[in-house]
Amino acid sequence: MATSVKRKASETSDQNIVKVQKKHSTQDSTTDNGSKENDHSSQAINERTVPEQENDESDTSPESNEVATNTAATRHNGKVTATESYDIHIARETAELFKSNIFKLQIDELLEQVKLKQKHVLKVEKFLHKLYDILQEIPDWEEKSLAEVDSFFKNKIVSVPFVDPKPIPQNTNYKFNYKKPDISLIGSFALKAGIYQPNGSSIDTLLTMPKELFEKKDFLNFRCLHKRSVYLAYLTHHLLILLKKDKLDSFLQLEYSYFDNDPLLPILRISCSKPTGDSLSDYNFYKTRFSINLLIGFPYKVFEPKKLLPNRNCIRIAQESKEQSLPATPLYNFSVLSSSTHENYLKYLYKTKKQTESFVEATVLGRLWLQQRGFSSNMSHSGSLGGFGTFEFTILMAALLNGGGINSNKILLHGFSSYQLFKGVIKYLATMDLCHDGHLQFHSNPENSSSSPASKYIDEGFQTPTLFDKSTKVNILTKMTVSSYQILKEYAGETLRMLNNVVQDQFSNIFLTNISRFDNLKYDLCYDVQLPLGKYNNLETSLAATFGSMERVKFITLENFLAHKITNVARYALGDRIKYIQIEMVGQKSDFPITKRKVYSNTGGNHFNFDFVRVKLIVNPSECDKLVTKGPAHSETMSTEAAVFKNFWGIKSSLRRFKDGSITHCCVWSTSSSEPIISSIVNFALQKHVSKKAQISNETIKKFHNFLPLPNLPSSAKTSVLNLSSFFNLKKSFDDLYKIIFQMKLPLSVKSILPVGSAFRYTSLCQPVPFAYSDPDFFQDVILEFETSPKWPDEITSLEKAKTAFLLKIQEELSANSSTYRSFFSRDESIPYNLEIVTLNILTPEGYGFKFRVLTERDEILYLRAIANARNELKPELEATFLKFTAKYLASVRHTRTLENISHSYQFYSPVVRLFKRWLDTHLLLGHITDELAELIAIKPFVDPAPYFIPGSLENGFLKVLKFISQWNWKDDPLILDLVKPEDDIRDTFETSIGAGSELDSKTMKKLSERLTLAQYKGIQMNFTNLRNSDPNGTHLQFFVASKNDPSGILYSSGIPLPIATRLTALAKVAVNLLQTHGLNQQTINLLFTPGLKDYDFVVDLRTPIGLKSSCGILSATEFKNITNDQAPSNFPENLNDLSEKMDPTYQLVKYLNLKYKNSLILSSRKYIGVNGGEKGDKNVITGLIKPLFKGAHKFRVNLDCNVKPVDDENVILNKEAIFHEIAAFGNDMVINFETD
């Protein structure tokens, strides 16, 4: 379809706007047939201005394939040959070369900022030397039985941190003793790869127990772990004594902790208190923010590694049946085996560091990247994103420097820069499967390194993350769950796309943005599961029965077992409705006093190490709302899959016949407007398979859903927020009218009828409801174009009258041939200085309204001619008028078509933008911010989600919008949106095509052309720079929101008062800070939607004569939600003039007052009285801000154009009392209260 304006006129428009306002035009007046306005936004990152330097590093991946051979650049059958592919590849490499230099400068600056202070390092090293001397003073301890150990510690401060199960003297026939350990530093501090951490860092010190303390079979049944616990307790006891002797006990605190949250690995943590008069010492390292971990390790290969492989059982238990085999004990085996490998891996990494100049810098980048996404080396089997921290990242990088490919080819080279090393590891994580389809093998033994086999990727997966060391037989990724690995892989993929993005600067998103501070931003849905857990002996019978001896052996702790069980149950129940699941044991602790044996052992019973379970989901938007969970097909003999399905779902399972004739086992779910289907599934599955008494809380989800106005339609309470049927009904009504008008016999044929109303793009706050004519969005705008004609008048006023004549003719035809349609005319004042615009308002028999306005090929030409012929002092006003015309007539078509497509691609965009509009209207901002601007701001988290995922829930999308606004420095940063559908992300396809030398088909080329190119992006940035050069503080124009549709960036954001823009930012910051400080709950959500009226200079409370809630098409909260409101109008009034009786007069009143007092006041009100106007929809408010110029006295001028009164002979002040009386008089009987500050 095409708009009516000729291309020549459009080019004239572009040239004039660039020349006069230094901005590009937004509308390519003709719209190509079938063009898709899709969207993939780009968050405007503050680009650092740096000089271009010579490239000292290549950003070419070592595994990149050769470019296709050069062939003739001919195009046939929609194909692009390899020559053009090569040209694209070269252009891309040029952009990447420049980006690589920029990244290098940013990385250098970042590394400098996080570098440890040398004086802090020296300070803590001084204490480490002292600690070494103290440890050497601890006396040896002869062999003791367990009974003697218990007797020794009976009256001591220190308790032995035995791991569960605690040994019993009569069953323990091995001895415990202490001999001096071998002491060494390990970890990042030893590698000099440590960085400054705001919450402090830890230094890992390894104390290796002598080999003679162990027997050959101590690796079985916790024996070596119990020996370590006694060894640690004895060391702690004497360390306390020696610290007191050296007068260091006044500022040093000792406590036990589980290293990496592994309950099988207790350590001693030493920290400092703040220096006081009594604790001043050269050894006090409090200001360094370091703590010291004393790890008790085993000698290297003290136990035969093969006996501790992940598939072996090393915990023997009594079996009820001899035929029953004991399960593997991978967690236990890893804990024992890894305790003997600390020093080995330090040597391995140190050797790699010496060979690779940028190894440490790349390690720091990896650490920052992981920390910002919530990953660590902690055990993830009891929840959290653990199992992959700095240590695992460095081991993987070292392995890839020695191979890593399918043919043992090197993935990384020792001469790579830190950026290339980091990108190489990220690419490997993103593209290689180390869980299901394969694993990576490497050799860490530093001996005979010249002949050491290379790392190799093996096409054999073990269904668990695997990075296997052939030297030590350790799977480095044992601590990582499948769920944690899947999320890591997805983050790596997202980061790789950001690294490959040559258009936008993504440095901040990759390294600087912490996405783990607030779960509701990181995850789409969060459910708090309260389990009936008390003391261990009181554990609910059904839950205890599933945690038998076999489960204890495999999972070690109940926390690990519960996390595994809940994950599996939720994953099976939700299937492809979700992408990822993460379990968190809220309240889990790893630190405990040296006076206690373990965490929570101080309460006289075995309490569990968590308060409740939080289930965190990342949703698949395209599948989450389906009504049916389909299982296996039905057959005469029940298959294993069918039996599992029926057993899992129980009474919910049923047989259903589908349209294709198949009969399938399935579960059918009901929808609700107050919560997603996923909530029902989670409740059912967890209560059935985990605990009948489990309490699953999701009140915040319901709260956000309930803030969306419920349409007064049948069964609306049972309709999902993703359901667009009410919008489809309106579109169907429009289609019928569309056909009627197209068939009319008019002097000029109708060329196109283009809908541009917000309901056509599914973004109107209130859903379309028949006969709801009190809704401000009831009349949906439509652009009507006729065929080209040279007879259109050559003057704007005459042209508008000619348009009106055509609309009159349409009304006559409609009245004569379609009597069920009713219509009337109204004057349109949306374009300043053009008061001759008339619109035709048509009411359909289905109960919907449409407002038709006419566009011709002459309009744009006449507006531009008026600007060219005007005096210089009048041109700014006329240019602003032309912008309004462009936005209303030309750009609105592309905007509507683009967002309509995007609403289908991003399922949650529609409800999110509608909720965002309600928030804006609650705070009286929507009257100043156009619908289009609100819609473009709300689309940012969808088209440019980095570093987060695309929103998969209403609350997640809404909170991300607020988060973006709170961080958007619109004075310095433009918002540039790449409006492309998510499935059109063909960067990976593009790279694969280039690398393989294959041809790019026309479809791929079209998708490439739809994205913003680097030149277009830089052009938009130049427009923003020009704008800020003329308006550096954003006084006249604050929000620069640009896209391919609107490279000028100002179409929808011009005319917003500065106080309104700053208030929007301030409100978003307050909202985000409130939620991060106090969490997401019913109270904080209510506060989000509570306006702060005390900030205004005056507030006028209004009440309309009649309530408008029902006539706005909104179902009242007090009514039964399964029936409609009978008081709502079911037809239009006989006299169409009566329509205005049920429309909110506040809008016209505020519009008039803003025109009258535009020089001195900024007035605001709520636009949607049916939504925010109280229970009946009859309450509104007018708030006023006095402009700063009129806050105090100033000199009198003739052209002040406002009501003032004299202070003295020269100065005047605003006559507020007179203005307030005038406003009250205009409001008349509607005013019920008038407050001033």
Swiss-Prot record:
Keywords on record: Nucleus, Phosphoprotein, Ribonucleoprotein, Ribosome biogenesis, RNA-binding, rRNA processing
Underlying gene: UTP22
Residues recorded as bearing Phosphoserine in the entry: 10, 58, 64
Example GO biological process: tRNA export from nucleus
Residue stretches of biased makeup (Polar residues): 61-78
Keyword Nucleus annotated: yes
Pfam families listed in its UniProt record: Nrap (PF03813), Nrap_D2 (PF17403), Nrap_D3 (PF17404), Nrap_D4 (PF17405), Nrap_D5 (PF17406), Nrap_D6 (PF17407)
Domain of life: Eukaryota
Residues bearing the modification Phosphothreonine: 60
Misc note: Present with 3260 molecules/cell in log phase SD medium.
Cellular compartment(s): Nucleus, Nucleolus
Entry protein name: U3 small nucleolar RNA-associated protein 22
